[in-house]
Amino acid sequence: MSTIVKVLGREIMDSRGNPTVEAEVHLADGSIGMAAAPSGASTGSREALELRDGDKARYLGKGVLKAVTAVNGPIAEALIGKDAVKQAELDQIMIDLDGTENKAKFGANAILAVSLAAAKAAAVSKKVPLYAHIADLNGTPGVYSMPLPMMNIINGGEHADNSVDIQEFMIQPVGASTFREGLRMGAEVFHSLAKVLKADGHSTAVGDEGGFAPNLESNAAALAAIKVAVANAGYELGKDITLAMDCAASEFYNKETGMYELKGEGKTFTAKEFNYFLEDLVNQYPIVSIEDGLDESDWDGFKHQTELLGDKIQLVGDDLFVTNTKILARGIKEGITNSILIKFNQIGSLTETLAAIKMAKDAGFTAVISHRSGETEDSTIADLAVGTAAGQIKTGSLSRSDRVAKYNQLLRIEEALGSKAPYNGLKEVKGTFNF
């Protein structure tokens, strides 16, 4: 029986030393699922609310005992006796019980942890892997693929204490024939980059997502360093390895002046000027994907950016869409970007996450599954990427066990599925590429 008999919440620690919510869901047949909510550093203003205690005397106000109390109290009471396999029903019960637009009463961190734990318990009860259960919930049973990783090997912005304003410089092993081979290629470039940075006198300390966080003279210098690292590792840029960036431009947008300020290199841009700045980088390097290239509220600027670059490369909305189908629907209607970043905790439940992925795919958008800067050992996003055949995943660099946990889970899944889960490389990325 997959009937829920116990729901338990607790406060645990994330990869940045901040508390987060972990939940357990126990079923009548002895099955148990456990999951933890991640937490972001650069967050969209329209994300579902992450409930924090606000008690400055405890964890600097970042405790999550209120959210844990919600799990152990009203959420547990509402879910006990329900069928864990009926994910949509469970999620709707929690959403209705919370009763707010952005899950402000219980916190998206509480609802999400329980939502994912219930899915894991249901998979155990069905005696299937989590990715298989997710495929069932997605209405695509038995349809899988291994995701092309976006590996964040230079961290800037809110993810690092350095002079680099653009938040993530990533590599994608598009020339690999399997995920395992792609992971190896990424690791080799990562270690090659360490040598390049050291030789130039830069620090090889890492940021929140495991990438290096050097002080560089410009954002373009990050791309130049990666170019050298790729060549030194024995790979060809544009053939074996392509590049991607997450600008997280809301973090350097000045709302008072309406300007984009790259303080690290002393430059200021209007929205159109910044779009042309990005176009220049795309013309210089094989960049196939740019995320959050403008402020989350700059829809006119995004329209211009999409007209300028949307036929050439993948333009990903993260802070722009916050995994929210209502906002995504507007983007699709207005022709804004061509891809969405998928983060569980931006919306706060598995069911709503699956709905966002489906809406994106139905509209011809790509969907990139993503971690957050504050992570745990929980590797659910690996199963989500495979179980929805999303095609791409962002889960950091090749260091820090909170990042590597997801890669290791993907290795296990590929081993189990073999040819049933193809690795499609650059075919998964939106754009027309002529390198």
Curated annotation (Swiss-Prot):
Keywords: Cytoplasm, Glycolysis, Lyase, Magnesium, Metal-binding, Secreted
Database matches in InterPro entries: Enolase, Enolase-like_C_sf, Enolase-like_N, Enolase_C, Enolase_CS, Enolase_N
Main location: cytoplasm
Cellular-component GO terms for this entry: cell surface; extracellular region; phosphopyruvate hydratase complex
Signal peptide extent: none
UniProt-annotated binding residues for Mg(2+): D246, E291, D318
GO BP annotations, alphabetical order: glycolytic process
Record: residues binding (2R)-2-phosphoglycerate: Q167, K343, R372, S373, K394
Active site: E209, K343
Cofactor: Mg(2+)
Catalytic activity: (2R)-2-phosphoglycerate = phosphoenolpyruvate + H2O
EC number(s) recorded for this UniProt protein: 4.2.1.11
Subcellular localization(s) per the UniProt record: Cytoplasm; Secreted; Cell surface
Details of cofactor binding: Binds a second Mg(2+) ion via substrate during catalysis.
Residue ranges of coiled coil: none
Pfam families, alphabetized: Enolase_C, Enolase_N
Molecular function GO labels: magnesium ion binding; phosphopyruvate hydratase activity
Record pathway: Carbohydrate degradation; glycolysis; pyruvate from D-glyceraldehyde 3-phosphate: step 4/5
Subunit text: Component of the RNA degradosome, a multiprotein complex involved in RNA processing and mRNA degradation.
Family assignment from sequence similarity: Belongs to the enolase family.
Stored HAMAP family: Enolase
Known function: Catalyzes the reversible conversion of 2-phosphoglycerate (2-PG) into phosphoenolpyruvate (PEP). It is essential for the degradation of carbohydrates via glycolysis.
Protein name: Enolase
Lineage: Bacteria, Pseudomonadati, Pseudomonadota, Gammaproteobacteria, Alteromonadales
Gene: eno
